[in-house]
Amino acid sequence: MTYNQMPKAQGLYRPEFEHDACGIGLYAQLKGVASHDIVKKGLNMLCQLDHRGGQGSDPLTGDGAGLMVQIPHAFFKKTCVELNLPEKGRYGVGMIFFSNNEDERREIEAYINKLIEEEGQTLLGWRTVPVNVGKIGKVAKESCPYVRQVFIGANDSIQDDLAFERKLYVIRKQAENWAQARQNRFYFTSLSSRTIVYKGLLTPEQVDAFYLDLQDEDFTSAFALVHSRFSTNTFPSWERAHPNRYLIHNGEINTLRGNQNWMRAREQQFVSDAFGKDLPKVLPILDAEGSDSSMLDNALEFFVLAGRKPAHAAMMLIPEPWSENPHMSKEKRAFYEYHSALMEPWDGPTAISFTDGKQIGAILDRNGLRPARYYVTKDDYIILSSEVGVIDVEDENVLYKDRLSPGKMLLIDLEEGRIISDEEIKSEMAHAEPYQEWLDEQLVTLPEVQEEKSEYFDDLVIRQKSFGYTYEDIHKYLVPVITEGKDPLGSMGNDTPLAVLSDLPQSLFNYFKQLFAQVTNPPIDAIREQLVTSTMT
């Protein structure tokens, strides 16, 4: 049985409708000092988020759990002596899920080896990741992948670590496109010289026991990003567990179909000095078979590797409300307005934490519909999670505690050893380029549509019929509001024909339905919450 058990589209089921809600966590040493204790406490944090994860009928098979850490250089130097690894940062590690078909695995490995050579990098070797399947659930065990790591050395001509990250990305994308065309299944959980992801169809308690690497004292990192997945209305699988390659995500992207279509439409217009002639090799940017979280990760990864700072890319994808905010600086408003013409917001209840291995950020959606709280300690640690209490901290060691506000960002720079505030990082991004000047010179706006005078109907019933009012609208909704001054109560069910199939006249609004995960989305009041609401699309 393959590790990927995702069903194909059939009947009323469509994979693109899937969303999930989860628990996220970050534990980091602000000065960038790596230790095994951070990994252990990250795993403990993950276990504390167990109640935010899901399980199937098999209680030992979770919806997914995992963690992202920095490349544990000392650990790999010890365990991969025969590979003669170069210094830290001069090699990348790919963590790969293969099917248990040995012939298929060898074929894919051979092709990856070929791509590494073609892209001018050095194949250092392969390693089978030791795992313990004894304590995982039956369903997880039946679909358990064969986990391997590939080690790739950087060409001597590459001195910029971002250029090396970009080359690893080019190798990965070509391998994925080749395998998809041949209907071969494999999955890179990560391929980077900075970070590595250990995850799977596991419960939080199983991650440490399943991946034996994590138990070694030489397995160190300056941060741990952890995630416990709850599949609200999705099918769990090994590759859909988090972390993704750049981010962890709690929530759902309600605008996914539009984001996906616009990204695909713009790909033919992409020009990149960073990628150069390699750009066609990495298309398409989004993995159409991925979840909403993985597609958001695909977009963030591409923009970062194309040269934008992680915070810049995050501000493009998940902007704070700007069109109705009178208190926003003109420079920041110009930044958001400029980028709104390039990229539609990936909107929906969202809390994400993201990293490129050097900077770690966290951001909330414009409505603040997902929780994210954090502590900063006097001994230079930060703890961020969906809730407090995930790691024990003595009260006297707490420097300060806070929560992320709607649309706001938190950024940690491990190289500078400090936390950068939302105001500072966004001011830096807004002043980096003359965005207002570019808007004045290049933005083409359409004149506003003037409202035409319509025929006046004095009769109330005629007006109500014209606008599609029904008996239920008047007597069940309006009358209670007028006579009793309270909102009427009603069920969510609606067994009337869809407007497009009805023989009766309908209100224009009845012809449109919003796609979203009903389970986890609270109602939005576009009038009272005008600041965070926009009709611009």
Language model: regions and residue ranges:
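Conserved short alpha-helical segments that host acidic/polar catalytic motifs at enzyme active sites
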Residues: 1-536
